[in-house]
Amino acid sequence: MLAVFEQSIGRPPPELSLPQAGIQKKEAKTREEIAESFKTWKQDSTFYHLFNGNFMAFSHGNENPLQPRSIVVMDDVFCIFSGALDNTFDLRKHYGLSRQATEAMIMVEAYKVLRDRAPYPPDQVIKELEGKFAFILFDSKASTLFLAR
């Protein structure tokens, strides 16, 4: 999974940084260079180009059958999901989704419900999830990026 937005990279706390002794810093790659590197590395990748040169990409290469990857776009909300939820039945029932709804669809619906209909922050979605997963969710209307692992 890969998502590139805007021109900045988050800085980790100093406690999580690697020692820089003797390491020369390389100049940061552009979004286009990152996309080309990913395409070269994962030739079967699928790209979703968003506004302002931003993009999301994923590949099924080397996919673990127990942790499948999927992507869905619903109502201008893009979601790349990797892994599996252990409580999909309960979540589908809670959000009124069909049995065919994938984990990515569940994530988008859960995000939209909390965003639109409840006075809760979107990170409340995480509390309901059980399983081993990671996702990148981008709401293009609200320009909101939400990810979890």
UniProtKB/Swiss-Prot annotation:
A Pfam family annotated for this UniProt entry: DUF3700
Tissue specificity note: Stem-specific (active at lower levels in other organs).
Domain of life, source organism: Eukaryota
InterPro entries hit by this protein: DUF3700, Ntn_hydrolases_N, TSJT1-like
Gene3D superfamilies to which the protein is assigned, alphabetical: Glutamine Phosphoribosylpyrophosphate, subunit 1, domain 1 (3.60.20.10)
UniProt protein name: Stem-specific protein TSJT1
Origin species: Nicotiana tabacum (Common tobacco)
Gene: TSJT1
